[in-house]
UniProtKB/Swiss-Prot annotation:
The lineage of its organism: Bacteria, Pseudomonadati, Pseudomonadota, Alphaproteobacteria, Rickettsiales. It comes from Rickettsia rickettsii (strain Sheila Smith). Its EC number is 2.7.7.56. Belongs to the RNase PH family. This is Ribonuclease PH. PROSITE patterns: RIBONUCLEASE_PH. Phosphorolytic 3'-5' exoribonuclease that plays an important role in tRNA 3'-end maturation. Removes nucleotide residues following the 3'-CCA terminus of tRNAs; can also add nucleotides to the ends of RNA molecules by using nucleoside diphosphates as substrates, but this may not be physiologically important. Probably plays a role in initiation of 16S rRNA degradation (leading to ribosome degradation) during starvation.
C-alpha cells in the first residue's frame, strides 16, 4: 500500500486551470496532487538564426522552480549567473516534446516560447510541465488563429507525460516526492495522442530492472496518459 493510499495505477488528483495569465497567448495552471506548474505559451515574430529566411517557425521552452517551491529554498538561477544541468535537461525535453506535435512549417517565421514555472514541487514536475504546456500551446494556437495570425492549425496531436516507477518492489504510477526519492526505478513517459511514444526516460536507482518490469511500467503509464488526454479534451472543449 502506498503512503498516500492510492492504488498502484492511480493518478493523484488533477486539475487544469485555463488562462490564468492574461498577457500570454495561452496559459494553464496544472495541479497534480501537490505539484503545481504554471505553463504559458507566447508567440514572437522572430526565429533562431539557423531558421531565418526559411519561412518556418520554432518552439522552444524554458523551465524553472520558484525559490519556495520545495521544502528548502532554492536559489534563483538568475542570481547564480547560470542554469543548472537539471534545468537545461528538462527545458530541452519540453521543447523537443512540443516540436513533435506541431508542424513548425505552418507557423511561418514565428517562435512560440513555452514557459514552465514550478510553484510547488512534489514529484513529477517535468511530466506535469509537458501535460500543462500542451494545453497552453493549444490555447495559444487557438488565439493566433482567431486573430488570423495563423491561417492553418499547425497542431498535429495531443501530448501528455507521466512518471512511473518501481517502489518497494511494486510498479506504480505517478510517483510523488517521497516515492520518487526512495524508488528502485524512476521513469518518465511522454506520449502522443494516439498512444505512440515521444520520449522515455528510465533510470535504475538501486538495482537493474528487467524487460518485463519495463513493459509493466509502460502499460501503466499508457493508461495514465489516456486519463490525461481525456481531461485535456474535457477542459479544452468546454472553454
Amino acid at each position: 500500500m502506498r503512503q498516500s493510499g492510492r492504488k498502484s495505477n492511480q493518478l493523484r488528483p488533477i486539475s487544469l486551470e485555463l488562462s490564468p495569465l492574461i498577457n500570454a497567448e495561452g496559459s494553464c495552471l496544472i495541479k497534480i496532487g501537490n505539484t503545481h506548474v504554471m505553463c504559458s505559451a507566447t508567440c514572437e515574430t522572430t526565429v533562431p538564426p539557423f531558421l531565418r529566411g526559411q519561412n518556418q517557425g520554432w518552439i522552444t521552452a524554458e523551465y524553472g522552480m520558484l525559490p519556495g517551491s520545495t521544502s528548502q529554498r532554492i536559489k534563483r538561477e538568475a542570481a547564480l549567473g547560470q542554469q543548472g544541468g537539471r534545468t537545461q535537461e528538462i527545458q530541452r525535453l519540453i521543447g523537443r516534446a512540443m516540436r513533435c506535435v506541431i508542424d513548425v512549417r505552418k507557423l511561418g517565421e514565428r517562435q512560440i516560447i513555452i514557459d514552465c514555472d514550478v510553484i510547488n514541487a512534489d514529484g513529477g514536475t517535468r511530466t506535469a510541465a509537458i501535460t500543462g504546456s500542451y494545453v497552453a500551446l493549444h490555447l495559444a494556437i487557438r488565439s493566433l488563429m482567431k486573430k488570423r495570425v495563423l491561417k492553418v492549425n499547425p497542431l498535429i496531436s495531443q501530448i501528455a507525460a507521466i512518471s512511473c516507477g518501481i517502489y518497494k518492489g511494486e510498479v506504480i504510477l505517478d510517483l510523488d516526492y517521497l516515492e520518487d526519492s526512495d524508488a528502485d526505478v524512476d521513469s518518465n513517459f511522454v506520449f502522443a495522442g494516439n498512444g505512440n511514444l515521444i520520449e522515455v526516460q528510465g533510470t535504475a536507482e538501486k538495482n537493474p530492472f528487467s524487460e518485463e518490469q519495463f513493459l509493466a511500467m509502460l502499460k501503466l503509464a499508457k493508461g495514465g496518459a489516456a486519463e490525461l488526454f481525456k481531461l485535456q479534451n474535457q477542459v479544452l472543449l468546454g472553454s
